[in-house]
Swiss-Prot record:
It comes from the Bacteria. The keyword Nucleotide-binding does not apply. The keyword Transcription regulation applies. InterPro entries: cNMP-bd_dom_sf, RmlC-like_jellyroll. Keywords: Activator, DNA-binding, Transcription, Transcription regulation. The gene is arfM. Induction: By fnr. Autorepressed. Activates, in anaerobic conditions, the transcription of the fermentative operons lctEP and alsDS, of the hmp gene encoding a flavohemoglobin-like protein, the nitrite reductase operon nasDE and the heme biosynthesis genes hemN and hemZ. Transmembrane segments: none annotated. This is Probable transcription regulator ArfM. It comes from Bacillus subtilis (strain 168).
Length: 158
């Protein structure tokens, strides 16, 4: 895909619904591409950024959970997710990041994204809607962490 293809792809995402093409183009120009391989460390999602999966998928897994339920988050082509400067909600050393070998992610630094949001209120609304969706994911992660912690702290035979 070339820049024009990426621009058209991004413009079709709910995040950029009713957002002028010029703003989407500015975000694309100021973003960087992360091309990955399998079994990334969480540090490849290292900065205060908004990430957009352009190709492949990224899976966050908790090694403490039983086989079959280790996946705590999965982002695929077209998904948008924010990560703070310390890896956001995935600070646990038990969380691993697995990306498909063909992964391509657009990393948009948050300060640039924030500046663009100040130019267009619809982008702000779309970003808030995306955060609301991620709050549910965060809550699920918290519940899993809490449940696992309680199991680890339980008295034998209780």
């Amino acid at each position: 895909m070339n820049q024009c293809d990426y621009l058209l792809f991004l413009k079709q995402l709910p995040m950029f619904n009713e957002v002028p093409l010029s703003i989407v183009e500015t975000l694309l120009k100021n973003g960087t591409f992360i091309r990955g391989s399998c079994d990334q460390s969480p540090s490849f999602l290292h900065s205060q950024s908004v990430y957009i999966v352009l190709k492949g998928s990224v899976r966050f897994m908790d090694t403490r959970l039983p086989e079959g339920s280790k996946t705590v988050a999965l982002w695929e082509k077209g998904d948008v997710f924010p990560i703070d400067e310390k890896g956001g909600l995935y600070l646990s050393p038990f969380i691993s990041v697995n990306a498909t070998s063909d992964i391509l992610i657009l990393n948009i630094p948050y300060y640039i994204f924030k500046k663009m949001m100040s130019y267009h209120p619809q982008l702000q609304m779309n970003f808030l809607a995306m955060l609301q969706q991620n709050v549910f994911c965060s809550y699920q992660l918290f519940l899993r962490y809490l449940h696992t912690s309680q199991d680890e702290n339980a008295e034998p035979g209780s």
